[in-house]
Amino acid sequence: QADPAIQVQGVSKSYRLVRDRPTSVKEAVVRRSRRQTVEDFWALRDIDLAIPRGSFFGLIGHNGSGKSTLLKLLAGIHRQTTGDITVNGRLSALLELGAGFHPELTGRENIYLNGAILGMNRRQMAAAVDEIVEFSGIGDFVDAPVRIYSSGMYVRLGFAIAVHVNPEILLVDEVIAVGDEDFQRKCLDHMEVLRSQGVTIVLVSHDLDQVRDLCDRVAWIDRSHLVEVGDPGGVCDRYVASVDAEGREE
């Protein structure tokens, strides 16, 4: 069996939370003798996951379960606290609205900037820029500073860049839900094209119908732990049953 596109072994991620932080200098002096408590919040615990090359891989779970944290670790934006992550291939990611954009630069300048970050040279980006602008549909706004963009324009340009830099692995958090329905359809259709070209796609989504339609494998993450990985139909059904059961308990 070929190496997976992404291998995650024993990965955990913790963040330090400082409790009882003073709100003013005076309060800090008055309370100097009282100790602040520092707690570790574990966003992910002991995750083992292999994402096959060329797969369309879904991540599902409640808000705050750890899905987006996992994507940020895979993209190298954050570093895991323990464990190993191996990424085999050139990775492009669309994770947070406006991430990777410099607000004072124009859309066109940001296209070149993002290309450089992803290892594309200026000539390669010059060849792709017209296609990126056309796909994004933002027209003349490409020469305006991105700080004036709407959230929808950010998504359009971000997605257009992410899919036109020849990625071998594409990570997409739910940001495309911000775009209008036509653009969402365009994004999903383009991801299907990339998949047919052998690109590995990892998608975080709350739209379970979308996950069932698009994905060939799904991982369910709950409260920082990996519950199961498997066939989209079965995993989504068990996830829905668990949400329903929790709803009845409340």
Predicted segments, located by residue:
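Pre-NBD coupling/linker segments of ABC/ABC-like ATPases
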Residues: 1-45, 232-250
